């Protein structure tokens, strides 16, 4: 079977465009499975987005554009902010309404002690700098995993892995604290004990309305638990976010598979901004940030280095797909217990 392929540009920090590729579902296969479903036209170039003022009546230019940023964070918080800000400004210049940053966008420390030392409260200088950046650029920011000193810091001396969503005015509109902590031992990758420095969040966050659609917040290891994504989808999410820092062993084996599975089972767009490359002598990340559509097709991706990729979110396509494949109407919660029930 031959997939229709269209070209799209990805952008590196050197500002020299690199030609990448995105795939769309086979037109004939989709038409056969879902008669009447409007499918993306094959072999249509994904050109550089026009400024909003120049947009014409063509539907493709009316779809919201999102940017997925990929970075290599280090313990140097100031340099990390400079790198992220450069990508966010580039995303704004290209017309994105929302930019996604990965888990640990603020820093990647060498050990738990350094993690605790570098952490800040939500109202600290770093988040303040990003609120100013959001206002300056006029776009929403998904800050994928901030090392947050919570209100219980003095008692616990532990932090939260906090996903912060800022609107274009720089206001914090939602926070989600990672509920599934990554305490694992992967052969060839070494042990990881996130709980040495981090507390699990107490609850999920209801999906948030944004210019791109209703977003459900999650972080990295959360993607391994489909109950979370199903709960967010049943609560109205149209876009699921998994900002991450996947390792070099689990990345090639599981990264794309898990993201596509979450998209297919929830019929949501999935946006996954990722860390990449070597952060320091003790840690490296897989990269390959991507956007997956509700059919499970990767519609945009970065490679291994720092940069960004762009995707348009087509909610009418999402709604048509849900109409033709109404899986949520066919669910049997009477058999599953509380598994995947909507958020209260």
Predicted feature descriptions by range:
Residues 1-34:
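N-terminal chloroplast transit peptides
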Residues 2-6, 58, 271-344:
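C-terminal beta-strand edge segments of enzyme domains
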Residues 59-72:
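Short beta-strand segments enriched in small/hydrophobic residues
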Residues 66-69, 80, 88-118, 134, ...:
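Active-site beta-strand/loop signature of hydrolases that rely on acidic residues for catalysis
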Residues 110-112, 247-253, 281:
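Glycine/threonine-rich flexible loop motifs
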Residues 122, 128, 132, 149-235, ...:
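Active-site catalytic loop in hydrolytic enzyme cores
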Residues 123-151, 266, 270-274:
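A short, hydrophobic beta-strand-centered structural micro-motif
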Residues 143-145, 161-165, 206-207, 289-291, ...:
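Short beta-strand scaffold segments in enzyme catalytic cores
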